[in-house]
Amino acid sequence: MTNTLAGPDRSRDISQPLEKLGPDEAMKVRSDYLRGTINEGLLDAITGAVSGDDNAKLMKFHGVYVQDDRDLRDERRRQKLEPAYSFLIRLRLPGGVATAAQWLKLDELARAYGNSSLRVTTRQTFQFHWVLKNDLKATIQGLHEVLIDTIAACGDVVRGVMASVNPSLSSLHAEVYDDARRVSEHAMPNMRAYHEIWYGEERVATSEPEEPFLGKQYLPRKFKIGLVIPPYNDIDVYTQDLGFIAIAENGRLIGYNIVIGGGMGRTDQAPETYPRLGDVIGFIPKEQILAATDAVVGTQRDFGDRTVRAHARFKYTIDTHGLDFIQGEIERRLGYALEPARPFEFVSNGDAYGWAKGENGRYHYTLFIENGRIVNREDVALLDGLRAIAAVHQGSFRMTPNQNVVIADIPAKQKPKIAALLREYGLDHRNEQSLLRLNSMACVALPTCGLAMAESERYLPTLVTKIETILAEKGLEKEPITIRMTGCPNGCARPYVAEIALTGRAPGKYNLYFGGGFHGQRLNKMYLENVGEDAILQAVDAIAGHYAQDKNPGEHFGDFTIRAGYVKEVRAGREFND
């Protein structure tokens, strides 16, 4: 493709002097490649946080967030105490794969430092919550013992790379997982600072550039990559900054269709921000995946907005400069024009629960984990049960993009043992849920997330129970409907592609959306703004009743809400706020 434009507007990107860019750009430059004064801040005994003006932001590049218990915030303020600080630690786990030995170490660290809780994320990794400052190094060094790190799990870098589950179901899945791992290793920052701060390694003087690809300013914002194998769009490939859709012939991987420009984040009352689904721009042979990654990430590095962070994601770079220009720039860096995209089809973006047998004769069990929270509760000992399984398991574990866990690669001879442990701990009944609940997803939100305006993980199960009653009354209990909730509009649970979605506005108040595509192919549209539970249930009740009466055979709920006129179809991200 030839670039026919006179030239791009470079007034907001990395070509400009530092003083013309946003404050985070200067912060990154002065951080000495993300070292800052984190070490000194960790030693400051006066506060439970990390002192130093830049360190809270810099620690995100290390996979660590400063948080506080918002349930206690007002009371501690009244007592003139600082917030009850703790830390979130997010792991880098390409493709969501962990060995049994790694699982046992995660369990040990969760019990020692993470409030006996493991949280599976919407990007196939784990988070520890409630880690105290004095336990940060012990936790990260414990992860290092089993070859896991937290590098680039947050920050203005390529985040954790996703891949369809289950890699071991076929040789195709294995190839795609291997590519996801290679992309992750290739695209991550070098980050010698991480090794010095968390592992105590000495700084080594060198004349070589410390970050030859990313440079001192890294990327304008986070950058998300995922690899998917049709027909299951479990990673929601259209929501990724860069997506690779695997194309196979005769069961063998030949290459990938490239998708660019997806992203969920937006801000209420800021119509210039919006979710966007990625565009399929062409096909590459499988051998070109690392070169394509460099070309796309490099384009965003050089042309992304570094003046206004709310406008810095790749989706806005594309809409600012135009898809034709961005594709032309990618092709210029590759040195060739992309081939036309190959045909593919998606049928859902959910998980298939229960037992499955791979072509190699090994078994896999997908276990429903409501909102990804692995803890022991009165009704089920999830943490204990999965630890018992990991202690004998001869295969691996896979975290799914829908926050569930696959006990994978089980030899046929070991299947009865794993099945017996599932029964012993009551895990064999976890999948016996409504299709609505099995297709539900929530972010963490309160009490730990500093951005949350309303409940999400703690509230969605209750709301789902009430909607289940409505659906059962109308004979819709066997209809698979996706429902997602977030505590703010940033979209961590990818709500804007769900058939029913709620994003928090204030305590007990949400925006209600309908019309997302069942396999993640279409954005939804706001139906009600800033409403409480009664209004939400009334709306669902009315539309579900109409759906039960007038739906076409095989018509999904999201499709019906558009056909029946409840919401308009959103054909492009810029239409989302219209």
Swiss-Prot record:
One of its GO terms (cellular component) is sulfite reductase complex (NADPH). Keywords: 4Fe-4S, Amino-acid biosynthesis, Cysteine biosynthesis, Heme, Iron, Iron-sulfur, Metal-binding, NADP, Oxidoreductase. This is Sulfite reductase [NADPH] hemoprotein beta-component. Its cofactor is siroheme; [4Fe-4S] cluster. It catalyses: hydrogen sulfide + 3 NADP(+) + 3 H2O = sulfite + 3 NADPH + 4 H(+). Siroheme binds at residue 492. Pathway: Sulfur metabolism; hydrogen sulfide biosynthesis; hydrogen sulfide from sulfite (NADPH route): step 1/1.
